Amino acid sequence: HGRGRVSTETAAHIMQIAKELGYEPNPAGKALAARKKQSHVAVILPSEGNPFFDEVIRGLQTSAEFYSSYGLKMELYTMKGYNAQIQLDILNRVSQSVEALIIDPIDDESIREALDKLVDEGKFIVTVNNDASTTKRHCYVGADYENSGITACALLAALTKARANVGIVLGNRQLLGHCKRLEGFFQRMDSLPDFHVAAVV
């Protein structure tokens, strides 16, 4: 089991015998061993009043139920809207009791600093739906928002024969994904001389 209680030579000999006998680790045994030490994962989502997250939460709960036999415990924390202080308060409250964190982060310096601090403390951080790409987070699960902005502009240009004054309704500037989508739109628009944005609201 690689816990360092036997010599390297003995371990190598045991592994060779196991290989010759076709030994395969028992998943059920692993699950029983994992139960001795639970892994806690906190999930923080701005999901209250936002049906977009219904399927996300359902998927998380299904996965948590499946992996619970392997010692995984998921704790879901929800909030309404995009108040950075509220999200930071939740982060500070749960961070010391978990080994990993899944979060839809608000694009605020206080949140970025908190995520970096958690990574430095050895926590595994996954951003979902919106990224915090300038942080030390381990991975991001979500859309390529900049490319979606480029695509939106290209489609609109095709529909208007590249001559238009456009009004853009943006969701929330506190979300990096929304800002990236706008950046992508303007990036594509740079090559369209008769295409203009009248206002962004």
Q: What is each PLM-predicted segment?
A:
Residues 42-44, 98-105, 124-128, 166-169, ...:
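Periplasmic-binding protein-like
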Residues 24-86:
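Amphipathic helical "hinge" segments at domain boundaries
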Residues 83-99:
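Short, well-structured alpha-helical segments in soluble
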Residues 94, 99-119, 185, 196-201:
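Hydrophobic alpha-helical
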Residues 1-35:
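N-terminal helix-turn-helix DNA-binding module of bacterial transcription factors
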Residues 103-147, 158, 165:
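Flexible loop/hinge segments that line or gate small-molecule binding clefts
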Residues 60, 152-195, 199-200:
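An alpha-beta-alpha
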Residues 11, 53-61, 88, 146, ...:
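Short, surface-exposed alpha-helical segments at coil->helix boundaries
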